């Protein structure tokens, strides 16, 4: 399926399909949501994630985002929104079930190398894959023109393909193998396991 965001413009019918699609998929999640997005600042999405975490005790959410915004305006907009998003989504939820993270590598000396995330992707329980142009930000949901693709798995091979894509991305961010990521995700404390997997001079996840 395709979901669009079309802002209010003269002689153009507006659309907020992306916003509604994201909320619907979050409310359908039961086990694991993986989000990879340049921005994580839309409070409505944070509230939906928090509500679903409280409704589904087995659900876990892992967000991988950028940690080093570029330019004065991006910095000002980014940090306030990220802090609010984090506070909302974590409210009343055990910390081992939700993490807002970034990927970085620490060389032997010098500053950490922070990976700049520009992708916009979400997986839901190996059942849904969303990939497109939409950031999890107020601007992207209302003012920009966006288009996202939604893939729904209706067979085991399709579910396996979505899981493989997610695990491949996590392997890149943690410097683990795909097989190692798969084993960690089967553990009860899987998010903590991914954050604790650190190697010298290689990329790993941190809060």
Residue spans of the language-model regions?
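Charged, low-complexity intrinsically disordered terminal segments
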Residues: 1-207
